[in-house]
Amino acid sequence: TMDVILDVVRRYDIDGVHIDDYFYPYPIAAPEVAGNAQALDGNGKPATKELDFPDGPAWERYLAGGGKLDRPSWRRDNVNRLIEAMYKGIHKEKSWVRFGISPFGMGRPDRRPPGISGFSQYDKLYADAELWLEKGWLDYFVPQLYWPIAQTAQSYPVLLDYWISQNPQGRHMWPGLF
């Protein structure tokens, strides 16, 4: 990934590199097996089992090498190291080329404003967007705020204010609209 991105930066007169929210794939429901009893979720509905991302061999090598992180933290660390390397590598090649990310619009569940609920990019895509803003590993940030203002659980103005509050480095904040 890095080789391709830096090759594009070197070879072409580009203004920026933009990546979307696909760090690890969005969860895919596992097929149901006939005759198996299905567990219930917290609402009494059948829980959806998700297929796991097939990174087992890399995970095993990490552990064999003395790695101490749990698997979700290890996945986030992989993404974080890629984001940091992309930002630094792009700016090393051409300081004027901008790097930005458009992550899913809701942040970490443990930091969300009251009343905000829904999908967790932190837990499911292993994307720690708050960390990237904190460290300044991007030039602009485009949170995907694809919900109506009146949709309380994913309130556009509440989420926009949240992301602005997570931006101590003062990076450009360009909210994505659907």
Where are these regions (language model features)?
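Polysaccharide-binding and catalytic clefts of secreted carbohydrate-active enzymes
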Residues: T1-W137, Q144-W147
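C-terminal soluble interaction/assembly domains
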Residues: G115-I116, W147-A150, S155-F178
